[in-house]
Amino acid sequence: MTAHPIKNIRNFSIVAHIDHGKSTLADRLIQQTGAVAARDMVEQVLDSMDIERERGITIKAQTVRLEYKAADGEAYILNLMDTPGHVDFAYEVSRSLAACEGSLLVVDASQGVEAQTLANVYHALDAGHEIVPVLNKIDLPAAEPERIKQQIEDVIGLDASHAVMISAKTGVGIDLVLEAIVTRLPPPQGDETAPLKALLVDSWYDAYLGVVVLVRVIDGVLRKGQKIKMMAADAHYEVDRIGVFRPKMQDAEQLSPGEIGFITAQIKQVADTRVGDTITDERRPCAQALPGFKPAQPVVFCGLFPVDAADFEDLRAAMGRLRLNDASFSYEMESSAALGFGFRCGFLGLLHLEIIQERLEREFNLDLIATAPSVIYKIVQRDGDTIELHNPADMPDPTKIETIEEPWIRATILTPDDYLGAVLKLCQERRGVQVDLNYVGKRAMAVYDLPLNEVVFDFYDRLKSISKGYASFDYAITDYRPGDLVKMSILVNAEPVDALSMLVHRDRADTRGRVMVEKLKELIPPHMFQIPIQAAIGGKIIARETVRALRKDVTAKCYGGDASRKRKLLDKQKAGKKKMRQFGKVEIPQEAFIAALKMDG
């Protein structure tokens, strides 16, 4: 590998909403610069996990180094950083963007600006990026490039008059994108003689190499055999391999300022390599770490239990392996009377939860039940202590509680005008507080403060269904606010079912409880005795349904004759049922749990 002057390096990322063609554009850039031989070209080269390809989303940051000979005759190194676009991975996005100096903003010329586009553009602007707008899919009959340019100027405030027009699918305009990267994005700044300072962008576990760390060198030089230190984790290692991605790994001797590449150092656990940490030289450390590092904080919690109790050990092993790769995922053991042994897991958000669950089921062949997702509540007790509550079943005695605080989010929703009424109604139902509402062309942008508790359940699905899939949604957690929350328990035959207990707002408890008991009534099969299903807050029953008993027709053998004879047989049956009900155990089928937890709030 020949060394390039720092002025000929460009580090850039691509910012886009799901399905606006980010990965396809990346494929075309890789193809155009000849980084991958034509026969090795697969769709979405950078999305390496199957789930990423199937869902069309990018989960981990990926990078590729492209070499490009520009129109001015100079050879440039272009480092493309493919970032996740989903809100759950917002912190990973901000770190990936911190590794670059510029971004391509890809907008679908037929769809226009979406909520996630906005969120990620703001991340890019916060990172001080130069942004080049790119209009994709101009080959579609529905494309309206002029209108979308105007929209970019109105909504984001970027000058879009020089936007690059492309069709990533057919390959039109890709060379213009490459020229724009070289001419309109700035080169990195860095001092080769200063002490080593590098940003840890991402890390993953490889069975042969241990942990592979994706780094962006800011100052100094990173060499093979160098002793390094991770500043936030305070871990020390010796670099044993350095290289760059062209998308396949290729070894190099060193990484200079402005370069993006990978290192391995026989690191055993991903927990030592935290995204956003600063890597420096052990002997000659840099004075201060790079700003913006935050340890990953789980936001959503839920219990994961194996359907078959015999799979518990396999589940434990599988979680350990996923944890190697994903330090933002945390778990601890828990047991539930209804579901047996399992784990209480913490996630960055709902998509993260779905992905982890899907990876456990897919990569490790496990059948899992997930309990209702819950958020972290802060409980201020009468004696002044504050505790964090991850699981509604562990709620302390209500008489000891002063206040319960719940997390709130600021949500930005972009929706076509026609569906605005339904969207506002949904936000109102979810205890939302309107902050702002304005129009962007034919679309409305509503900004709401909402309790996260109301969003984790099924808000996203409901939003998509009432807007026929057109509304887009993005959120950031803002603060904790006190709320009138109560713990709702579900009792089946007077026995509380711990897996179904949840914290709800007092105003919504009645409806939530009623829906839950009606749902369970359909799902629990009839037994030989009648089964009451109740929703309760403390000792007060707020909703009840009864599953009727199966009964034999005891009077069938009486033909005509005395009514008192029939009465006697019926009374005898009644007494038997009553006794049975005292001793009977109700079997709740697994499907009932799964369906009740998927319940539409």
Curated annotation (Swiss-Prot):
It is a peripheral membrane protein. Signal peptide: none annotated. Its main location: membrane. Its EC number is 3.6.5.n1. The gene is lepA. GO terms for cellular component: plasma membrane. This is Elongation factor 4. It catalyses: GTP + H2O = GDP + phosphate + H(+). Belongs to the TRAFAC class translation factor GTPase superfamily. Classic translation factor GTPase family. LepA subfamily. It comes from the Bacteria. The keyword Transcription regulation does not apply. It comes from Methylocella silvestris (strain DSM 15510 / CIP 108128 / LMG 27833 / NCIMB 13906 / BL2). Keywords: Cell inner membrane, Cell membrane, GTP-binding, Hydrolase, Membrane, Nucleotide-binding, Protein biosynthesis. The keyword Iron does not apply. GTP binds at D19, H20, G21, K22, S23, T24, N136, K137, I138, D139. It is an enzyme of class 3 (hydrolase). InterPro entries: EF-4, EFG_III/V, EFG_V-like, EFTu-like_2, G_TR_CS, LepA_C_sf, LepA_CTD, LepA_IV. Required for accurate and efficient protein synthesis under certain stress conditions. May act as a fidelity factor of the translation reaction, by catalyzing a one-codon backward translocation of tRNAs on improperly translocated ribosomes. Back-translocation proceeds from a post-translocation (POST) complex to a pre-translocation (PRE) complex, thus giving elongation factor G a second chance to translocate the tRNAs correctly. Binds to ribosomes in a GTP-dependent manner. GO terms for molecular function: GTP binding; GTPase activity; guanosine tetraphosphate binding; ribosome binding; translation elongation factor activity. HAMAP family: LepA (MF_00071). One of its GO terms (biological process) is positive regulation of translation.
